[in-house]
Amino acid sequence: MRVIGITGGIGAGKSAVLDFLQRNYKARIIQADLVGHHLMEPGNATYYPIVEQFGSQILNGDMTINRQKLGAIVREDFGKWEQLNRIVHPRVKEYVVNEIKAAEEAGMDYLFVEAALLIEDHYDAICDELWYIYAGEALRRERLKKVRGYTEEKISQIFERQLKDEEFRKHCRVVIDNSGDLEDTFRQIRKEL
């Protein structure tokens, strides 16, 4: 089984790539963000450490973590963003390692793990290779405004904290250019697999 890490800047089209991989290959797909959200649910691995670190003001009435409130706190303070990452990311990675074992036992051909901090969190140690899903900054900004309704200010804040193109290219064996139409993107993927 090949374990492939998928990364790229926000708005690059990683979700479209993952959808294609899920539909066309015998593969297990893991999205680190979704795992992180699951781990934040009451009783799960990161719930109590996050509440302890950020206080009860991040909780909804039903005691679940309000991710919008938490997000607003960490967007405003880089130190708090780093604190949150120190709580969440090691536990997400532990989950991924366990899922790799399970996928191997299930006879999967591929396991794709998508994570924003794939490079920073050293997923190269557990992946056979890393892929960078690329789209230019102007196109990504346009997608984020249109699809997610993000403001320029919010987009700039997010971009500021993400790796630059040259860093992604330095660490990833494969670059999939997702600037054109999706058929071209899918053709590049088929060539690699």
Predicted regions and their residues:
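Hydrophobic anchor at the beta1->P-loop junction of P-loop NTPases
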Residues: 6
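P-loop (Walker A) phosphate-binding loop of NTP-binding proteins
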Residues: 9
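ATP-binding Walker
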Residues: 12
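Walker A/P-loop
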Residues: 15
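Short beta-strand-centered segment that lines the nucleotide-binding/catalytic pocket of NTP-utilizing
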Residues: 27-40
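ATP-dependent small-molecule kinase phosphotransfer cores
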Residues: 37-108
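NTP-dependent small-molecule kinase module
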Residues: 98-110, 124-129, 133, 137-150, ...
